[in-house]
Amino acid sequence: PSGNLIRFLNKLAERFPDKEFSTLAYLYSMQPPKHTKPHPNVNIMLCDIDCKREVPLTDNESGQWFVKALEGWSAISDNIFVWDYGINFDNIVSPFPNFHILQKNIQLFKKNNVTMHFSQVNGIRGGDFSEMRAYMIGKLMWNPDADADSLMHTFMNGYYGDAAPYLYQYQKIMQGALLASGQPLWIYDSPISHKKGMLNPHLMKVYDELFDKAEKAVENDKTLLERVQLSRLPLQYSQLEIARTEAGSDKQKSR
């Protein structure tokens, strides 16, 4: 299907050579055409919306389908824009531990002639570590080979102060639990999908204890305390969502 689209855009590009035209390589048009090359002033906006996010795009089946498309477009164009997704759109205030994949994905884009990159990772105040995600992605766009873990430490120390060590532990424990669970991380996920994995009862208790320590560490600094409490919202939201699904089973047990 992308062949017809690109041929149409090429006609426009020929008629208006001083203009640049951008088109989506999205869902049905994601894969590149076999017999047509986009003109230099035709920009390809390639979207990875269907990919799972628990590992880099190169490391799972849904991501590899996107990588195939990216490599195909890269072979015929130097004018590629990637629209990347990095938050949960159905449950935006919920944990989304994808920090460990950011660098490899950005390096992949750079390797394949991507000259523009939009990372849709923030939407509202109170999203899962949204400030840190924006900071890390911004830094990695400037330098894809920067030390990602060092960037996380730098941000946390500056933004959370003495609470930083506990929130770093929180991130790393949840990341490890996600990978160990084998459960995909999807942009239309529900916390309920992870209640036997990274959000199981034992880990939820661990997370709460870490946030309690984080709040205690900055209790005398109103600004830092509010930042920690705001970052706790995704955990609290998950607790409420999971509890909602289990309320009926508790009633059954009591009968």
Model-derived segments and spans:
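Catalytic domains of carbohydrate-active enzymes that cleave complex glycans
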Residues: 140-255
